[in-house]
Amino acid sequence: MDAVKKAILGEVLEEEEAYEVMRALMAGEVSPVRAAGLLVALSLRGERPHEIAAMARAMREAARPLRVHRRPLLDIVGTGGDGKGLMNLSTLAALVAAAGGVAVAKHGNRAASSRAGSADLLEALGVDLEAPPERVGEAIEELGFGFLFARVFHPAMRHVAPVRAELGVRTVFNLLGPLTNPAGADAYVLGVFSPEWLAPMAEALERLGARGLVVHGEGADELVLGENRVVEVGKGAYALTPEEVGLKRAPLEALKGGGPEENAALARRLLKGEEKGPLADAVALAAGAGFYAAGKTPSLKEGVALAREVLASGEAYLLLERYVAFLRA
């Protein structure tokens, strides 16, 4: 029996079958009807970590290649789809982490649930989203930061985009987005839209040879200034509160974003170190987790302290300006 049919019948796929199914989807070899049946069946049954990892491998292989030599290579990324409409914290945290000396390949797309995804925000900040992949790779090598726009790096997604759009429900691709970094990031802070995905996504990361933290905070795919749940790859689960890392508690409301232009103005103030308060603290928390995940600091608390120093220095804004200019050169 073929693997697509097997999945539609609700059976768990072997690793090789999951890989083969995704390879076929990326090659446009699966009809829209069968593709829809497959995606819905997987979602209803619940994707297994070995299936997710195998599919991520196939998607990475179908992506436009980007060879980056710097290691560790960090990505701070979320699944999206949490419906919370928060400010794009992961994007700003990625710039802070890079300004603090960790090489970052930030993989992202346009908005999933907020009014502004990472691509929307960076575009409003002057970043050329359509820059050639090799130029983005050079930026990571030279500046320590690059934005990998999913639409540019994953052209094979055109085969499944209409099916996903028409279904309008969560599919395995919501989980695969963060795992398919074309530069092959090996350190992650990965936010998930629901706590049930913490352990499976951590296992998928481990199977892909990556380290890091899978996080969920009060219904959001981000670390928030309240109750967070974390699964550290290969190390287990724990709760995390802002007080433990020297930050003040704040409600989710305080982390809400607006449209791209509004967010861009706020982002500039944050990156220049001019914005104090909950948003700056939330960015420091995510960037601090990034420093810890990449092995830059021995603890999350020290990571947050370093992130606050970097934010206050305005270095992250200077890096953004250099990156914008580098892509235009």
Swiss-Prot record:
Anthranilate 2 binds at residue 164. The keyword Magnesium applies. GO terms for biological process: L-tryptophan biosynthetic process. Keywords: Amino-acid biosynthesis, Aromatic amino acid biosynthesis, Glycosyltransferase, Magnesium, Metal-binding, Transferase, Tryptophan biosynthesis. GO terms for molecular function: anthranilate phosphoribosyltransferase activity; magnesium ion binding. Pathway: Amino-acid biosynthesis; L-tryptophan biosynthesis; L-tryptophan from chorismate: step 2/5. Its EC number is 2.4.2.18. SUPFAM superfamilies: Nucleoside phosphorylase/phosphoribosyltransferase catalytic domain, Nucleoside phosphorylase/phosphoribosyltransferase N-terminal domain. GO terms for cellular component: cytosol. Its cofactor is Mg(2+). It comes from the Bacteria. Mg(2+) 2 binds at residues 221-222. Binds 2 magnesium ions per monomer. 5-phospho-alpha-D-ribose 1-diphosphate binds at residues 78, 81-82, 88-91, 106-114, 118. Mg(2+) 1 binds at residues 90, 222. InterPro entries: Anthranilate_Pribosyl_Tfrase (IPR005940), Glycosyl_Trfase_fam3 (IPR000312), Glycosyl_Trfase_fam3_N_dom (IPR017459), Glycosyl_Trfase_fam3_N_dom_sf (IPR036320), Nuc_phospho_transferase (IPR035902). It catalyses: N-(5-phospho-beta-D-ribosyl)anthranilate + diphosphate = 5-phospho-alpha-D-ribose 1-diphosphate + anthranilate. Anthranilate 1 binds at residues 78, 109. Catalyzes the transfer of the phosphoribosyl group of 5-phosphorylribose-1-pyrophosphate (PRPP) to anthranilate to yield N-(5'-phosphoribosyl)-anthranilate (PRA). Belongs to the anthranilate phosphoribosyltransferase family. Homodimer. PANTHER family: ANTHRANILATE PHOSPHORIBOSYLTRANSFERASE. This is Anthranilate phosphoribosyltransferase. It comes from Thermus thermophilus (strain ATCC 27634 / DSM 579 / HB8).
